[in-house]
Amino acid sequence: MFSYMFWNNKGGTGKTSLAFQVICRYAYRNLGQRILAIDVCPQANLSELLLGGLTNGGSKNLLERQGLVPRCSIGGYFQLRLPSPFAVPDFSVRDFLTRPAEYNSNIPENIDLFAGDPLLELQANAINTLANTQIPGTDTWVTVIDWIKDAIEQVRDQYDIVFIDANPSFSIYTQIALSTAHRIILPVMADDSSRRAIQNAFSLIYGLKLPSDIYSKYAFATKLKQADRSLPKVHIIAKNRITQYMGPASAYAAVLRSIEKDVSNLIKLEPSIFTFNNVTDGVVEIRDFQTTGVVAFARGCPFYKQPFGKLHIDGHRVQVKEDYRDKCIDAIDTLVDKL
């Protein structure tokens, strides 16, 4: 069972919308495989999309799942672990999983969902405290970091691939998610804050270019390595929301080139943290989804199932052009081809 995580240390990069389309497209192209989507984000936007989106009751369906006993979400599972943080309790992970296709007919039936939950923010302080508790003979931090790993270990033979979407922060629940991932997909935008965010991401995950050596002892990478655990590798840099205005001479292109240059320098210095040896092999350009994306996400619909022509969305009449929709499908396929 292999796992990919969509993450960057910045919001607004289109991470969740990209994750939604990639997960659905991968599942559709690989109907013989079982896919598990894990939403480790308090906003739970990926879960809402998979469960129906704005116009098809995604929020209502998610609240219904969170209202079950036990609470059918990642927050419900963490709630189970809080009284038993250092020993795996007797439980079935199936109690916390959802089949999105039962709520949203647009979603392939080979996808299961570990839904997101706003409880994560409330639980974060308690989880942090437990992870930093000193108990002789117990590595409490690693034991807590393994919570998601403990859960999916039960169904390891039942899934072929796991996709994880996580909050842009580097909170404890994000670290729990990162420790579970084998590969990272880093979405970036054509702005300087994305460049800083990707630099921050490499510092936070791999402990690179820390401002002082005093931080290295407490770094995520240091703690995982001390436990003889491997770090996830960067697999794809996704240049997201590329438009026709981002030609070679544009300011946007200059920012994206600077990001590529930073990554290229890191490949030379730390080749072991990448799955590619040349930056061009790891970069994927994703065109801006425009109206097609707005409509698809409102309906909780993958692009390949998105009808074209005039559609009604929340009382408004909008038009989706067939060629635009097809270009969106092609853009997602360029990323899925690399998985």
Predicted regions span which residues?
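C-terminal lobe/tail of nucleotide-utilizing enzymes
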Residues: Y218-L339
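Phosphate-binding loop that captures ATP/GTP phosphates
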Residues: Q43, S47-D112
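Conserved catalytic-core segment of NTP-binding enzymes
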Residues: F2-Y4, R29-L31, V142-L269
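Extended hydrophobic secondary-structure segments that form protein cores and membrane-embedded regions
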Residues: L36-C41, D112-G116, I164-D165, V234-N240
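Walker A/P-loop phosphate-binding motif and the immediately C-terminal alpha-helix
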Residues: F2-P42
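Cytosolic-facing regulatory segments adjacent to core modules
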Residues: S84-I107, D112-I164, F170
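Phosphate/oxyanion-binding active-site loops and adjacent basic polyanion-contact surfaces
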Residues: G14-T16, G137-V144, S194-I198, Y324-V336
